[in-house]
Amino acid sequence: AAIFTALRERGLSPWLLDLGGGFPAEHQGNSSHPSAYGEAIAAALIDCFRVDQPRTLIEPGRGIVGDAGTVVSTVVEVVERGDGRWVFVDAGIFTGMVECLDEAIRYRLSTSAIGPTGPCILAGPTCDSADVLYRHDPVELPLSLRAGDTVRFHSAGAYTACYSTIGFNGFAPMSVRLVN
């Protein structure tokens, strides 16, 4: 509001406020409904601008497209190591899952395997040491999980396909399939 006031004092007539984006996808079941964001934005606009509110633009981004996509990966190998059970899948940091770096995004996971679960370190297929999706906070996956089973990353419709590298370490980029 202060910037709009300063611009008006200089003879300009700002009429549009772009609030940008950042509405979250439903990664862990703790996102608010979009109406909650709308209510908070409306209240802030009234508080800041009173009756002289500008037209407002928001860019909900992954809040719209995130839930529209699921990455379906295949288990390449399951290995017991000194630091725990490692599950290697064909979707990794370099094949679309770069937002798992530093475990920045925690995707909801489901698998084709069933039964009791246990902690595991989830890693991508390349030999690069950075190709580890979840290590510091291991994920719970079925103990029966084997090579050939699937692991699904839910709410992964935002950015994953465009982040996929082409031919890194000889791996093909992530394939995209549209489903009705």
What is each model feature region?
Residues 1-78, 133, 169-171, 177:
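Active-site loop/helix belt of alpha/beta enzymes
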Residues 51-180:
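Charged (often Lys/Glu-rich) extended helix/loop segments that serve as interaction or gating elements
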